Amino acid sequence: MFDKKAARLRRAKKTRAHIRFLGVHRLTVNRTPRHIYAQIISPNGGEVIAQASTLDSSLRSGATGNADAATSVGQMIAERAKAAGITKVAFDRSGFKYHGRVKALAEAARENGLEF
C-alpha cells in the first residue's frame, strides 16, 4: 500500500543523510495545515541554533497557514541566522514539495541573506 506520510518521511531521511555527509548547517522546514516552522540546525544535528515559526508572538495575530505567513517566517529565520553568524545553509524541506508555503519560506530566506 502506498502511504503518503511514509513516502514523505523516506524522502526526508535520504535528504538528511546527504546533508549530514556534507557537514553544513541545515535550514529545516516543517509544515502543518495551520502553522509553518523553520529551524537552523548544527552540522552534527545536536543543536538548534535559530528558530522561527508562525507561533511567534509577532506573527500569531495574523493568518498563519498561508504563503504570506511563510514569507514572514523566512525573513525572520534569515535575520536570526545572520545574528548567530550563519550565512550558508543546506535547505531541508523535510520531504515536502518545493511549492507553495515551503517555496515562499525558502525564497524569503534567500532574499534576506541566506545562501543555500
Curated annotation (Swiss-Prot):
Keyword field contains Ribonucleoprotein: yes
GO molecular function, one term: structural constituent of ribosome
Key words, A-Z: Ribonucleoprotein, Ribosomal protein, RNA-binding, rRNA-binding
SUPFAM superfamilies per the UniProt record, alphabetical: Translational machinery components
A biological process term (GO) from this entry: translation
Assigned GO CC terms: cytosolic large ribosomal subunit
Domain of life per record: Bacteria
Gene3D superfamilies: 3.30.420.100
Family annotation (InterPro entries): Ribosomal_uL18_bac-type (IPR004389), Ribosomal_uL18_bac/euk (IPR005484)
NCBIfam families the UniProt entry points to: L18_bact
Biological role stated in the UniProt entry: This is one of the proteins that bind and probably mediate the attachment of the 5S RNA into the large ribosomal subunit, where it forms part of the central protuberance.
Protein name as annotated: Large ribosomal subunit protein uL18
Organism: Psychrobacter arcticus (strain DSM 17307 / VKM B-2377 / 273-4)
